């Protein structure tokens, strides 16, 4: 019994650089870090865990090093797929639309307002050789057109034969929202073309107006597409009508605008969302009914395409407006 305190003190010395008798400040040399105080004096566990930098030393190395490096790399990749010579731009079968071939193939349009992105999309700058000798090559900027964000892009990716939207054309866009797809349509028609963008809701309408400030070929109209007579003084005759209004009476809305603004033999491109028209029947039945309504309004259907896998229960219908009747 007499020796117990002494032996405990000794044990304390071994355990913590005098955790028992003279409890040496819980850590001998270097407090909790040094050789980790001693939870075993200089034993292997203490050394490995604490070392001379303890937690900061061994763990901090990898944390600051590779992780920081990797993050930097990611940041670099995100600034837009600026491939230069690595990316090859090829024209798509639809004029004004292009394919960027690199690590992955991307649908792109030539940016009407270089340096400006609309919804955070990637931009690709490519040097195009000059047509004359002695003239430096020009940089052309393209914007990636995401088919998951745009019904028209989804239709192009799905293989639409006819688009009616091409460089120099005038397009009436119904249901413009904040201008995501409108900005790409503006790129397709180019500086010689025009896009009349009609949107009824004021909040996305504000974003549409701010986008149009940078693109002189977009004319934003904050008005109800059900009443085309309210904006008839702003719009001339157009070559194509694109509609993405998602309303039960959308066939009527398209017909009213086509009768008022669309040229004879002009194109009609309609995105149909089945659930917005009738959610009680299957999508195919809804699409068939809508196509029949278009026929009754002198719009001859040319093709119908589902937007899977980009959109569920959506289709896109291309038609030609026959003013004199089908």
Swiss-Prot record:
Binding residues annotated for S-adenosyl-L-methionine, in chain numbering: 180-181, 199-200, 224-225, 244-247
Swiss-Prot/TrEMBL catalytic activity: L-glutaminyl-[histone H2A] + S-adenosyl-L-methionine = N(5)-methyl-L-glutaminyl-[histone H2A] + S-adenosyl-L-homocysteine + H(+)
One Gene Ontology cellular component annotation held by this UniProt entry: small-subunit processome
GO molecular function per UniProt: histone H2AQ104 methyltransferase activity; RNA binding; rRNA methyltransferase activity
Keyword Transferase recorded: yes
SMART domains recorded: Fibrillarin (SM01206)
Pfam (any one): Fibrillarin
Modified residues (Asymmetric dimethylarginine): 8, 11, 15, 19, 23, 26, 32, 36, 39, 45, 49, 55, 59, 63, 67, 71, 74, 78
SUPFAM superfamilies associated with the record: S-adenosyl-L-methionine-dependent methyltransferases (SSF53335)
GO BP: box C/D sno(s)RNA 3'-end processing; rRNA methylation
Database matches in PROSITE patterns: FIBRILLARIN (PS00566)
Key words of the record: Methylation, Methyltransferase, Nucleus, Ribonucleoprotein, RNA-binding, rRNA processing, S-adenosyl-L-methionine, Transferase
Modification after translation (UniProt): By homology to other fibrillarins, some or all of the N-terminal domain arginines are modified to asymmetric dimethylarginine (DMA).
Superkingdom, natural source: Eukaryota
Biased composition (Gly residues): 7-83
HAMAP family xrefs: RNA_methyltransf_FlpA (MF_00351)
Biological function: S-adenosyl-L-methionine-dependent methyltransferase that has the ability to methylate both RNAs and proteins. Involved in pre-rRNA processing. Utilizes the methyl donor S-adenosyl-L-methionine to catalyze the site-specific 2'-hydroxyl methylation of ribose moieties in pre-ribosomal RNA. Site specificity is provided by a guide RNA that base pairs with the substrate. Methylation occurs at a characteristic distance from the sequence involved in base pairing with the guide RNA.
Subunit structure, as described in the record: Component of box C/D small nucleolar ribonucleoprotein (snoRNP) particles that contain SNU13, NOP1, SIK1/NOP56 and NOP58, plus a guide RNA.
Protein name per UniProt: rRNA 2'-O-methyltransferase fibrillarin
Lineage of producing organism: Eukaryota, Fungi, Dikarya, Ascomycota, Saccharomycotina
């Amino acid at each position: 019994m007499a020796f117990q305190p002494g032996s405990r003190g000794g044990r304390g010395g071994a355990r913590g650089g005098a955790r028992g008798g003279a409890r040496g400040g819980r850590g001998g040399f270097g407090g909790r870090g040094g050789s980790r105080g001693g939870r075993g004096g200089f034993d292997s566990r203490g050394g490995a865990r604490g070392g001379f930098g303890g937690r900061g030393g061994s763990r901090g190395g990898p944390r600051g090093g590779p992780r920081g490096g990797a993050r930097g790399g990611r940041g670099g990749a995100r600034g837009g797929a600026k491939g230069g010579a690595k990316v090859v731009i090829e024209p798509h079968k639809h004029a004004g639309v292009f394919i960027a071939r690199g690590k992955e193939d991307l649908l792109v349009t030539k940016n009407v307002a270089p340096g400006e992105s609309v919804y955070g999309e990637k931009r690709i700058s490519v040097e195009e050789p000059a047509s004359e000798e002695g003239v430096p090559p020009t940089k052309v900027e393209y914007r990636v057109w995401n088919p998951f964000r745009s019904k028209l892009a989804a239709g192009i990716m799905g293989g639409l034969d006819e688009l009616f939207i091409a460089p120099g054309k005038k397009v009436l866009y119904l249901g413009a929202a904040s201008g995501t797809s409108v900005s790409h349509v503006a790129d397709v028609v180019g500086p010689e073309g025009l896009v009349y963008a009609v949107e009824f809701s004021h909040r996305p309408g504000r974003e549409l107006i701010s986008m149009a400030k940078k693109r002189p070929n977009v004319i934003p109209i904050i008005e109800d597409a059900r009443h085309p007579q309210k904006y008839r003084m702003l719009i001339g005759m157009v070559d194509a009508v694109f509609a993405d209004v998602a309303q039960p009476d959308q066939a009527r809305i398209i017909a009213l605008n086509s009768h008022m603004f669309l040229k004879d033999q002009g194109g009609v491109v309609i995105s149909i969302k089945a659930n917005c028209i009738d959610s009680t029947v299957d999508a195919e039945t809804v699409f068939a009914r809508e196509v029949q309504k278009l026929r009754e309004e002198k719009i001859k259907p040319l093709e119908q395409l589902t937007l899977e896998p980009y959109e569920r229960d959506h289709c896109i219908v291309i038609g030609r407006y026959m003013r004199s009747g089908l």
